[in-house]
């Protein structure tokens, strides 16, 4: 559908692009629930407008994406360990290789679907992604080969689409907290699926597991209906309808003079009060930013050296996140002594750190943007990048002092938690920088950055395959220092 522009009332929305300016509370409003002059309910509690629908759908989808993405890995690992189907060394090796296959598919998918979303819109891209993910996921269950394990990673493109959706719907002043909440909830899905799979595998008859294994794909498939029929690509409506409208009027310089466009109204009324109408003549030409695509502009994105700096930062940061999940018992020096249920609880606990760290990092980034504009966001990235590297260095030095697997376990766990929390603060600041780099190719930019994050997970796991934990962590910390220097030189 095409939304009437009378819905984008100041001060709740950016009058130039229809993007929402708040999520949890309207700015400069005394009321927590609604804005006094327009009576607009805060987006987090509303489903009326496309912004709120996109946010709530993105929350549901991103957690389902991560649950489904890590479902087969966690299912096979827990089942093999619980029933002692294989030796521990074989289980660990198989888990590591399966994880790397998944991240390879994730790297490709994130870049491709960022590009596709810029061309055909988020809704249709998401529907295609879900269909392919279900197809490859079920095929992987039935046939189980390396190619299908890689293709199973295609579902990771949903991270890009969900983040891109809220970036398209919400204004730059709150992108840190909105994308931070989204990323935090999504990564928490990893812990959730490990808990669910362990609980059910340890509770139900082994013969029934063959039916249980399909449930995430069925649930994911059901989301196609609300995505396609109950949501919009951008604040103005659906990509295809807007593209058609734009093409019909491409040669008209002032689109406000068109008299026969039924669903567009440039004048905003609030309770029959026209006090805001002069302040809210929306520049409809800005719709072009949401629906235009150019191959030449797309490839020009990669000439931006600042994009490389952010890509390396996300490679380092999200690479740490994925590496911790895969190697936590090794880092804690308890790989051979810890029980399966405690391993699952550790994964759950570390995934839960995302719920706190990412939104806080995003909120701090937004506040600095409010005070210092884009330079404020960049400085916060550098601060959290340096703190994460420092935490990693302290952890590295502490690990060197350990003499046995059970010595100083609590201190080691605390240091890893601090390292992970600082890293989550960093991740909460990164995505909010993307619209400042190229607002007309956000899918390509976000897809590129997110792909580097998956590459970080691949490299981190390869490093832990060939080096001991101390040396592996040292390599990661050195890369963190190099990344900090590159960011300081390029971004400031």
Model-derived regions: residue spans:
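Conserved MFS/SLC helix-loop-helix module at the cytosolic interface between two early adjacent transmembrane helices
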Residues: 108-143
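Extracytoplasmic gate region of multi-pass secondary transporters
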Residues: 75-77, 304-362, 427, 431
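Residue-level signature of mid-helix packing/kink "hotspots" within the transmembrane helices
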Residues: 73, 102-111, 157, 191, ...
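Extracytoplasmic
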Residues: 56-84, 88, 193-194, 322-329
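Helix-loop-helix hairpin linking two adjacent transmembrane segments in secondary transporters
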Residues: 182-238
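Cytoplasmic helix-loop-helix junction between adjacent transmembrane helices
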Residues: 149-185
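C-terminal transmembrane helical hairpin of 12-TM major facilitator-type secondary transporters
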Residues: 375-429
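Cytosolic juxtamembrane N-terminal segment immediately preceding the first transmembrane helix
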Residues: 2-78, 299
